[in-house]
Amino acid sequence: AERFVSRALEALDSSHLQLNVITREWQGPVKPDWQIHICNPRKWGRISRERGFANAARALWQRESFDLVQSHERIPGCDLYRAGDGVHRRWLQQRSRILPAWKSRLLFADRYHRYVMKAEREMYEDPHLRGVICNAEMIKREIIEDFGLSADKIHVIYNAIDNQRFLPPGEDTFAALRAKWQLPLQATCLIYVGSGFERKGLAAAIRAIAPTDRYLLVVGKDKDQPRYQALAKSLNCEARVRFFGMQSETLPFYQMADGLLLPTLYDPFPNVILEAMACGL
């Protein structure tokens, strides 16, 4: 979301607009005309974290009387909402497919997920909501089906790619990158890009390459990374599953790969698809 917001700020940067960002923390670029409001109240758990930020952010924008509030979080009272994560209940349904029945029941009973679904419904039913932006027709249909929102309030705007930046590599670049990261030049390497390994299907990706001679290049982070490393070890493919962590520049990793492997459970129009295609994967 931060990368999207940074790009949106760049596009909207104008002397005719006063741009404000309300966030828990900001690590992106800052321009003199941008106002960054750090809003990070004390928290005691996941629900407290979400509810505290929502209440504090709403209080701030009401106090400042902004002309237009676009939110990337499920906060009732915003004018525009970008549904980049889709519909939470639909994500839980997809997640439950890979869980035992008893875990699936616990998933929908979980207090945190119930809070998120309640906040989402309150946001869609709030009279202040003037429009919703989503990046896939699937999400538009799900919002209409789950919340009864009018179709003319929902705008599908597809993700874009800078194809002057994301390019296929030349032979020399490809060979140099393979040598730098100690990957065999002739090996078939599949890249996986994304954080939140469960949602993005990393376990399925590891199991898919295990019985082959393919390499899997994992770019992203997750607090449960050791569990996925243990899975690779148990399948005797740990030498071919390389974890590179979070990378501020992903281009070199696309350029040294042969293909993209992203068996994600629920991920509307992920940017990595466009980035990989632009790099010739």
Locations of the language-model features?
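Carbohydrate-associated surface elements
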Residues: 138, 160
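A short helix/loop element that forms part of the nucleotide-sugar donor recognition site in Leloir-type
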Residues: 167-183
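Membrane-proximal helix-turn-helix segments that form the acceptor-binding/catalytic region
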Residues: 109-132
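Short glycine/serine-rich donor-binding loops of glycosyltransferases
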Residues: 251, 270-273
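Aromatic "clamp/platform" in nucleotide-sugar-dependent glycosyltransferases that forms part
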Residues: 246, 265
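A short hydrophobic beta-strand element within the catalytic core of glycosyltransferases
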Residues: 260-261, 276
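A conserved mid-protein helix/loop that constitutes part of the nucleotide-sugar donor-binding site
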Residues: 2-7, 188-211, 223-226
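Short, structured helix-loop element that forms part of the nucleotide-activated donor/catalytic region
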Residues: 173-175, 214-239, 244
